[in-house]
């Protein structure tokens, strides 16, 4: 999208917001941002604030090793697998809602095989780590009416 199209769409969006916004005696933060609220909800707007967070972290590892010396001679095999998963969800409502969620996962694997009689060897390793973090906050700040005349 070039700059001209962006500016045109921005102007159209602002004009639509101005045309559709209703006048409210006490202007709330939400109204200043472009949404319109009925006059009856201005005093209890703090109850509508909320914050939500979701985090997921998953890990998987698989290791396999194999060594054979045939016909019908020595053979070796080794296998390793692992999986970890963490999921967190936090939803908070209220005046000072805070959200914090953390998640971490780790999986390690190691496999080894060895054969004698003319030698055969195999080795496999695997390591996985995963992390996730979510933060959030919601608070309606009090208006400062100092020095203002009604």
Swiss-Prot record:
GO cellular component, one term: apoplast
Record bears the keyword Iron: no
Superkingdom field: Eukaryota
Region (Disordered): 57-82, 119-150
Signal peptide: 1-21
Comp. bias intervals (Low complexity): 57-67, 119-135
The keyword Signal is annotated on this UniProt entry: yes
GO biological-process terms attached to the record: mucilage biosynthetic process; seed coat development
Entry keyword set: Signal
Family that this chain belongs to: Belongs to the UPF0540 family.
Protein known as: UPF0540 protein At1g62060
Origin species: Arabidopsis thaliana (Mouse-ear cress)
Lineage: Eukaryota, Viridiplantae, Streptophyta, Embryophyta, Tracheophyta
